[in-house]
Each structure stands twice: as C-alpha cells, then as structure tokens.
Amino acid sequence: LKANDEVLEIGTGSGFITACLAHMARAVTSIDIHTDFLETAKAKLNTLDLNNVRFEQADALTYQPQQQFDAVLVTGAVAVVPEAFKHWLRPGGRLFVIQGLSPVQEALCLTRNGDLFDVESLLETDVAYLTGAQPESKFTL
C-alpha cells in the first residue's frame, strides 16, 4: 500500500487488519455484516487514536460503495470472486481475495488494467468464507 491510498476492507473482524491498514493508507473504509464485530473494532481503534477509518455495517455481496478504491482487501474467502468487487477498484487498483473450494483455496491479487484484470496467484490456503459467500451445496452419492 501507498501512504495516499484509499482502501476498502471487506470483513472487519477483530479490527487487527483494519489497524494495520490505517497505519499504511490515507483512508480506510471497513465493512462487516456483524454489528458486534464493528463495535469491538471501533473501540479498539479508538484507543489507538486512528482517525482515518470509517466503519459501515453492510453485506459485502450487496454493498454499493459511493466511490472506487486504490485497494480492496477481502478478509474471508469466496467460492468465486464477485464481479462487483473488481469494479470497486480504480484503474491500477489491487484486489486481495481468497477464492476457491475448501480445503483448497487460493489467495489472489487482481490488478485493474483498464477493463481487464491481471491475476497473480500468491499462495494456497484454507480460511472461513464470508457470510453468504460459501459455495452452493451439491448432492452427491
């Protein structure tokens, strides 16, 4: 991240990553579907005197931000990267997301290049899905 970046964090969680982002970027918008996570993170960040974070209660899968961002960080996995996440990026912006079917998921960095996206595979992992972003159940015998 660059010092003048505006960042969107999807999945506030405990606020730890939010605090890290706030130290590195100019402005951070952090969204979470769980109000209790947001309240806990706000309280923690207030003790650190970080004033460049805006918290919003929202479902990432239906979220409609009022702006685009230099970077978007998704802290939970998705079965498939929603197209909307990509369009929240400014030209040259980067999206960090974990995609795939547990137990084999892939951390990706997508960089917006006009209407196209360069995709870099970073590592394999296995993390919990964002609420509502888990794969559909399939019936098998």
Regions found by a protein language model. Name each.
Residues L1-F117:
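Conserved nucleotide-cofactor-binding alpha/beta core module
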